[in-house]
């Protein structure tokens, strides 16, 4: 077996290669559970918004980052760097707004409607991919639990907003699945698309490249290793050409006060929120707990000997998020695509007594519904 394929696990006997479609009953359970969790979150948001006389549609489809993506679909990208007050739309990667523009051109309704529908559709493909990875490694029960846990993340509402997280998670999940099933070129092409979707697309490319370089004697693996980063590099290079400077994309990031600082800003925020702030903002506490829990889960994933592609993807994603010196509050959302971090929980829940499993999942689902509404209607900044 090549180094790109997952070794057999003690939880299920090795079987002949199969496609996800051959496990439709388990997949149907996972997707129904996913839709149920997200529908409950949407219901709680709607009821909360009704009590506040607040519309739900703008929250989901047209505010914050969604507004920028719609602006790119309508008017294209900026031609100049601008000042240091943020607002330059070159910071946003192009695949999602290009899809919005293309699909809206051949379908009825507004581009905002198209963008939201694309995000919801992508979330279903992402949930399918999350289930496929869990099922491949540990069986259908873990696959279903992993899907539910991903749906029930505190910032899970973003999966059904006009943002790129669902599209990116779908591409990342299926790229990882392709690596686990020894299809390096498929994984590489998906990594190219992921690299055109979000800055953290480089984490998907890293997972593909590192895994494939370990199979350097195989021409397909070497080709995949070279191909995987090209999407990310292409957009970053295009921004440099557009602005006429070699550091174009990173200069744009600096206008948003977002650049790598080795984690100093993260540590400062931790210290401020956990030690000095007597009345910290509740949403920032959630972000802090999410970051700390994610680091602990990565260590647990490594101890559990998770397959290398998953460890590289989540490790690079976590490294980027923790060492960024930019805005602090969206970092829980930035980690939303890093679903393999939830695998240790899913595996242990699968072994737990049903009563304990039900209690934990119910708490997670209800908590996600509450936090989604709080994030959208009480927290005054972007998710």
Q: Where on the chain are the PLM-derived regions?
A:
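Short hydrophobic/aromatic helix or loop-helix immediately within or flanking a transmembrane segment
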Residues: 63-78, 85-108, 263-267
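Signature aromatic-anchored transmembrane alpha helix within multi-pass, membrane-resident enzymes
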Residues: 225-229, 351-382
